[in-house]
Design a protein with these regions (language model features):
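Positively charged n-region of N-terminal signal peptides that target proteins for export
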Residues: 1-4, 50
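A residue-level marker of the well-folded mature domains of exported/periplasmic proteins
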Residues: 16-312
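Bacterial N-terminal signal peptides
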Residues: 5-15
Length: 312
């Protein structure tokens, strides 16, 4: 009986050791990448860049995301669960600039460095909670919106009736793009923003919202969408109204489908970000912080306006 108990205990001990070794991936440090969603090409590209960097730097990358980009509560749960697994660093694209801060308090308490990617934290909420990110990795969304607005003014000769598809109200990324666009066009007396409504980053909502917008304002001749998915939805609404070729569409992200639309002439332009570069820089920054290296508070990723003249 004693021998049997000893054998069982030994087997359990070996099993536990194997489990720990497997979880730690042979002692490699683990970086968690928590994305808004993986049902969007932008974040799929970001994951790809992050994985390439993780493979090159010899760290384990754990990637999780909510089903929908607007599901802040699910993202908060993911963050809390990731921290409990003993990660060494956390890179996150916040679904809610304010809401996510309460989950990041747990990362702070666990001394897990935080790398914020693409969407900034609300500065007041973060300061009030004592949450400080090691760095922000992303493009300047305000400048991107301004780039789109400047293009519209030039392309229309300063005369346009514009409908805007916003992201999620109160969401830093969309708000900054919207502010940049508005600032770019406000000096042109001939440019009028006749409607501006949220479509929550989704293609279906882009279609529905712009279809209703077009019915209410049939004189709209230009649309700025704060993301390409919403822009692609607007293009479908334009086609349904048999107005293809009469309304300029400007998007943001330069997704592959948007580039195809630009080449086909159904979209005028899109502001390109480089999500794979963001993912790469996020993992590189996380590894540097884990090694005690100092990194800049902001790591900027370039922007580029894609039109029919340079689309690839």
């Amino acid at each position: 009986m004693k021998n049997t108990c000893l054998l069982v205990a030994l087997a359990l001990s070996i099993g536990c050791n194997r489990s720990t070794s497997s979880t730690a991936t042979a002692g490699k440090p683990t970086v968690a990448l928590v994305l808004k969603t993986l049902n969007h090409p932008f974040f799929v590209d970001m994951r790809r860049g992050a994985q390439e960097a993780a493979d090159r730097l010899g760290v384990t990358l754990q990637v999780q995301a909510a089903e929908r980009e607007i599901d802040v509560e699910k993202q908060m749960q993911i963050v809390e669960n990731m921290i409990q697994t003993g990660i060494q660093a956390l890179a996150i694209t916040p679904s809610g600039s304010r809401e996510i801060v309460s989950a990041l308090v747990k990362a702070r308490d666990a001394k897990v460095p935080i790398i914020v990617v693409d969407t900034r934290l609300d500065p007041k909420a973060a300061a009030d909670a004592g949450v400080r990110a090691a760095t922000f990795v992303g493009s300047d969304n305000y400048e991107g919106g301004k780039l789109a607005g400047d293009y519209l003014v030039k392309a229309t000769g300063g005369k346009a009736r514009v409908g805007i598809l916003e992201g999620i109200p109160g969401h830093e990324t969309g708000d900054s793009r919207l502010r940049g666009f508005r600032d770019a066009v406000k000096g042109s007396a001939g440019v009028a923003i006749v409607a501006s409504q949220p479509a929550n980053w989704e293609r279906d909502q882009g279609f529905n919202v712009f279809q209703n917008m077009l019915q209410a304002h049939p004189d709209i001749d230009s649309v700025f969408a704060c993301s390409d998915l919403m822009a692609l939805g607007a293009i479908e609404a334009i086609a349904a109204a048999r107005k293809t070729g009469t309304i300029r569409v400007i998007g943001f992200d330069a997704l592959d489908d948007a580039k195809k639309a630009i080449a086909a002439g159904t979209m005028e332009a899109s502001v390109a970000q480089f999500p794979s570069e963001m993912g790469r820089a996020a993992v590189e920054s996380a590894v540097k912080v884990m090694h005690g290296e100092r990194i800049p508070e902001d790591i900027k990723v370039k922007l580029e306006l894609v039109t029919k003249d340079n689309v690839k």
